[in-house]
C-alpha cells in the first residue's frame, strides 16, 4: 500500500470511529405499535455505507480511486392484521430512487406458511442472508453466485410469485418451494415460470425462520447443510436462441464456541449454473465456490467509549466461467480477502476493514472500510 492509500484509509477509519463515538446506544429492533393482542405495526431501518480505495483505478490509470458510497438504506415495515396473517413491506434506496424491495403477505396455515407477492425466492444461504446478515465479510463473494438467482426478476434479487415454507423435527428440517415470474420477454416467449426450492437440515441447533444469518455470535451450536435449486424452461438466451436455465447450490455453516469464549465460524458453498450452452446477458454458465473462516475474539474492548469485539476473517472465492459473460470474459477468477470487524451489537452495529485481491485478466487490489447499523 503506497503512502497516499494509507493516508486515505487511515483518515477514513478515524472519521468512522469518531462518528461511532457520538452515536447513542442502538436498539435491537425498530419501533412497534401495538393495536391489540394480535394486531401491531412495526418499522425499522438498515444502513450500510463504505469507502473503497482501488489501486490504479483513477482516470489517470496509475492513481488509486477513492469512492465513498451508500450501499444500502432500507426501511422495513411489518403489519400483523391477524394472529396468522402478516404483511411485510420493505423499501431500499437505489441511486436516486426508492424501490420496493419486498411486498408480501404471509399466511400461517399451521402445517406450512404461504407467502404471496414480491419476495426473495428460496435459495442459498448467502441470498437469504442479504447484505446485512453475512458473517464477517462485507459483501457477497465476487462471482460466487454467478449472478444472483433472482436477478432476472425484480430489484434486489426479489421476484413476484407464491411460495410455501415448512419445517419438521423441531425445526431442524426446513423446506421451501416457490413458483415465480422469472425471465420476462426475451428468450421466454411462452411466459414460463421459474421453479425454486430449498432444503435445509440442522444437525445441531435448529435455525429459526426462513431468512438466515451466517453467524449467531456464539448463541448457538451450528452444523447446517442447505441445498437449493432453480429451473426455468426457456429462461436464458434470446428470442431466437432459447435455452433452459438450471442452477443449484450446496452450502454449509459450522459454528462453535471455544472454551475461552471465542467463536469460530466455518462457511462454504458450491454453485453450478447451466444455461444450456446459451449466452445470456444476466446469467453466466459456470461453477464456483467459496470458503470463509472467522474468529470472534472473547471479551469486549472499548474504542472511543464504544464496546465491541474484534473478529478477524479470511475468505477465498474461485469462479470458473464456461461461457462468456456480459463483459465477454471467460475462464477462471480467484478472489482472496482478509479483514477484521469491530462487532458492537451483532448485525445491528459493526465496522469492517478489509483488503481484497481479484486475479482475473489482471490483479486488482481493493481496500474497503464499511459500517452497518440497523434499528
Ranges and model annotations:
Residues 36, 58-62, 106-108, 216-375:
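Outer-membrane beta-barrel pore domains
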Residues 3-48, 170-172, 375:
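N-terminal periplasmic/intermembrane-space "pro-region" immediately following the signal or transit peptide
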Residues 30-58, 62-185, 189-207, 211-215, ...:
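Outer membrane beta-barrel
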Residues 22-26, 56, 128, 279:
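Amphipathic, positively biased hydrophobic alpha-helical segments used for protein targeting
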Amino acid at each position: 500500500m503506497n503512502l497516499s492509500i494509507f493516508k486515505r484509509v487511515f483518515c477514513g477509519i478515524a472519521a468512522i470511529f469518531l462518528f461511532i463515538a457520538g452515536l447513542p446506544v442502538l436498539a435491537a429492533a425498530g419501533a412497534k405499535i401495538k393495536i391489540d393482542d394480535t394486531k401491531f405495526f412495526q418499522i425499522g431501518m438498515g444502513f450500510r455505507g463504505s469507502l473503497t480505495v482501488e489501486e490504479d483505478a483513477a482516470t489517470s490509470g496509475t492513481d488509486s480511486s477513492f469512492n465513498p458510497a451508500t450501499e444500502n438504506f432500507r426501511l422495513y415495515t411489518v403489519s400483523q392484521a391477524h394472529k396468522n396473517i402478516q404483511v411485510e413491506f420493505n423499501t431500499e434506496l437505489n441511486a436516486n430512487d426508492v424501490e420496493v424491495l419486498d411486498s408480501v403477505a404471509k399466511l400461517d396455515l399451521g402445517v406450512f406458511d404461504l407467502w404471496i407477492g414480491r419476495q426473495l425466492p428460496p435459495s442459498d444461504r448467502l441470498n437469504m442472508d442479504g447484505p446485512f446478515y453475512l458473517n464477517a465479510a462485507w459483501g457477497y463473494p465476487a462471482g460466487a453466485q454467478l449472478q444472483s438467482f433472482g436477478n432476472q426478476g425484480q430489484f434486489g434479487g426479489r421476484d413476484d410469485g407464491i411460495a410455501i415454507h415448512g419445517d419438521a423435527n423441531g425445526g431442524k428440517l426446513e423446506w421451501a418451494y416457490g413458483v415465480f415470474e422469472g425471465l420476462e420477454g426475451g428468450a421466454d416467449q411462452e411466459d414460463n415460470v421459474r421453479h425454486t426450492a430449498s432444503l435445509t437440515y440442522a444437525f445441531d441447533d435448529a435455525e429459526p425462520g426462513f431468512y438466515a444469518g451466517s453467524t449467531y455470535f456464539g448463541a448457538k451450536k451450528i452444523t447446517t447443510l442447505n441445498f437449493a435449486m432453480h429451473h426455468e424452461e426457456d429462461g436464458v438466451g434470446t428470442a431466437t436462441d432459447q435455452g433452459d436455465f438450471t442452477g443449484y447450490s450446496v452450502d454449509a455453516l459450522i459454528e462453535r464456541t471455544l472454551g475461552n469464549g471465542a467463536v469460530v465460524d466455518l462457511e462454504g458453498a458450491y454453485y453450478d449454473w447451466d444455461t444450456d450452452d446459451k449466452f445470456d446477458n444476466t446469467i453466466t454458465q459456470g461453477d464456483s465456490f467459496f470458503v470463509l473462516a472467522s474468529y470472534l475474539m472473547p471479551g469486549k474492548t472499548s474504542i472511543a467509549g464504544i464496546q465491541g469485539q474484534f473478529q478477524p476473517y479470511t475468505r477465498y472465492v474461485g469462479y470458473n466461467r464456461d461461457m462468456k459473460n456480459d463483459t465477454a470474459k471467460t475462464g477462471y477468477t480467484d478472489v482472496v480477502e482478509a479483514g477484521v470487524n469491530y462487532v458492537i451489537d451483532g448485525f445491528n452495529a459493526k465496522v469492517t476493514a478489509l483488503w481484497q485481491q481479484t486475479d482475473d485478466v489482471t490483479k486488482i487490489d481493493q481496500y474497503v472500510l464499511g459500517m452497518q447499523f440497523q434499528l
